A protein has these predicted regions:
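Surface-exposed, low-hydrophobicity segments enriched in Gly/Pro/acidic/Ser residues
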Residues: 1-497
Length: 497
């Protein structure tokens, strides 16, 4: 029963992916603007591609639900059912329209299956074309500038003034190019509106900061942004904020090649291993800074399910170990770790360094009424981060009563701080069949995050703690109709207060 299967695909993609952590403002429901992956301030989000998370929970779109989104402006607004506070953690994943370059991708997948083994090979490549940017061809000067910039493309600005046909009626804002003298200096400047009979020009303007540019934005009562030359003062210092420059974005290429295998040792034991080679070329026009383009990743898992510890009482358990190594130059196509990963590990500064992540767990079931889960994990990045995290959960069901408890405890250290992060929680739920299947639940949730300076051995202002106590009553009138009444109290604690 050996089976070999292959699949592949080629396509032109509409957009690029980004994961963005929103910087929230206390009491501000929005709108919050979503930027591009390369720092673009204004993007068009592709409809239906967004996934919005609040405190690790995915939200639903709609006026009668959690949030709404304006795809054209790339702005998210939250509904009154989700009150935004300074402690809210909002992460948005989305794809946005990328009009810089024509973007294509291809993938190839090969699988070979036997009774006990599976081997797979996957390749993926996503790249920008080199021919067009912002709807116009790159000039020879543009390509030379990109070739010299390497990966430092954020500082590459080029002249954006270009000619267009006088008969082009689709463009409202256009200019004439004239010569003028300021302080004895000769300037060739753009003047609005375009004068018929002269060469017609358009330009993209970039904000270079107050008193750093020669143009300012003005209101001319037309459908479009108009800029006027304002020159410089007597000391030769510019008076404006904008210049006719455009920020060059280099075409990039992302690639991933993986080889993996799965071994079914027996009906309950599985061993999986996968290696990956990534490639990221941030500038296809330049060979400069290409030394860090390739990186390697490795993942190994061993899991044994349904181990019988005691036949009487049906005591069974699952055990497993996992190891993951990610090279410092390894670049993923899209984020594969959950949105709360950095918070779970109390990471404040992301360091580009080889990362080792390991985990071992035991999930024990004592019949149908009691379970106990325990896991220990370690995350290490050379001298930049070392963390050990322990997690445990217990669940007990007694007729109509259910009790669950969870706790996570992290000990971590970086070159600047030590931290201890504990998160205990518990819930008791009681069903009352004689009262129309009413359900009463009492829950407790807390977090204690203690951060201390390594140098001064003092508590840092980023430390925090909170406790939440919640009482809830749910009344199920029918299968489709239910009501919930709850009361909740939260206490927040900050250092030095």
């Amino acid at each position: 029963n050996n089976i070999l299967s292959t699949s592949g695909g080629v396509a032109i993609t509409k957009g690029k992916f980004n994961r963005f952590t929103v910087q929230v403002i206390e009491g501000n429901q929005g709108p919050y603007r979503l930027p591009g992956a390369e720092g673009e301030l204004f993007v068009i989000v592709l409809a239906g591609t967004e996934r919005v998370y609040l405190d690790g929970v995915i939200l639903s779109r709609g006026y009668d639900r959690d949030y709404i989104i304006d795809y054209n402006s790339g702005e998210v607004t939250f509904m009154p059912s989700r009150i935004i506070t300074k402690d809210s953690r909002i992460v948005v994943e989305y794809e946005y329209s990328n009009q810089q370059y024509l973007r294509s991708f291809y993938n190839l997948n090969v699988n070979y299956n036997t009774k006990k083994w599976n081997f797979n090979f996957n390749s993926y490549s996503e790249q920008d074309g080199k021919n067009s940017a912002r709807g116009r061809d790159l000039t020879a000067e543009d390509k030379l500038a990109l070739g010299a910039s390497g990966d430092s493309i954020n500082n590459t600005l080029v002249n954006s003034i270009r000619e267009i046909e006088p008969s082009n009626k689709s463009i409202v804002v256009s200019y004439s190019l004239i010569d003028t003298t300021v302080n004895g200096k000769l300037f060739s400047i753009l003047k609005f509106p375009w004068q018929e009979g002269s060469t017609r020009y358009i330009a993209d303007f970039t904000d270079v900061g107050a008193r750093n540019g020669y143009y300012n934005r003005v209101n001319e009562g037309v459908n479009g942004r108009v800029y006027r030359f304002v020159g410089e003062d007597a000391a030769g210092r510019p008076l404006g904020q904008y210049n006719p420059l455009s920020k060059l974005t280099a075409p990039n290429r992302k690639q991933m090649f993986t080889f993996g295998t799965t071994w079914k040792v027996d009906s309950n034991t599985i061993v999986t291993a996968e290696g990956a080679l990534s490639g990221l070329d941030n500038n296809r026009f330049s060979a400069k800074d290409d030394a860090d383009n390739q990186g390697i990743g490795l993942n190994i898992n061993i899991v044994k399910n349904n181990m019988i510890f005691r036949k009487k009482g049906n005591w069974k358990g699952d055990v497993g170990v996992m190891y993951e190594r990610v090279d410092k130059d390894f670049n993923i196509i899209n984020p594969y770790r959950n949105q709360e990963f950095t918070r779970d590990w109390n990471i404040t500064n992301i360091v580009k360094e080889t990362q080792h992540l390991g985990r071992a767990f035991l999930n024990q079931r004592f019949g149908k009424k009691l379970y106990l889960n325990y896991g220990v994990s370690g995350l290490f990045q050379d001298i930049y981060f070392q963390g050990i995290k322990q997690e445990a959960s217990i669940g007990l069901t007694l007729k109509k009563t259910t009790i669950t408890t969870n706790i996570s405890y992290l000990n971590s250290q970086s070159p600047t701080e030590r931290s201890q992060f504990s998160r205990p929680s518990a819930t008791i739920t009681q069903q009352l069949p004689k009262l129309g299947n009413m359900i009463i639940s009492l829950s407790y949730q807390s977090e204690f995050n203690k951060r201390a300076s390594v140098v001064a051995d003092t508590l840092l202002a980023s430390s925090f703690a909170f406790q939440i106590l919640r009482l809830s009553i749910v009344n199920n009138f029918t299968k489709n109709i239910a009501t919930e009444v709850y009361t909740q109290r939260r206490n927040d604690y900050q250092p030095f207060t």
